[in-house]
């Protein structure tokens, strides 16, 4: 398998990314596509988790719901925090809202992002107020 290390300058010059179709690769490439809109994706997974992430990334709604998709919850938490001057409520199914997200939220807040719990501390749903991060290091 050929390995490619991507950085911003490489991605900006890409037209398309061909992936294996795995859910893991698909979710990661969807985040890249949200940052670099010129990319087209070949062989995107048809999994429910990937569809949920793609739907939420393309939504113009303030209230986002990931259902049972844990990867979408975590990826969206980090991605939405970077969208300056935008506010979101991110939630999931009853079961998703019982799954801890505190370590990720603390790390992002320690970097200068603005994420708050709407209900129970350490668990979704969360409010995300997008901003520019102020730090580049965090201790976990």
Residue ranges and their predicted role:
Residues 1-140:
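Structural preference for solvent-exposed beta-strand-turn elements
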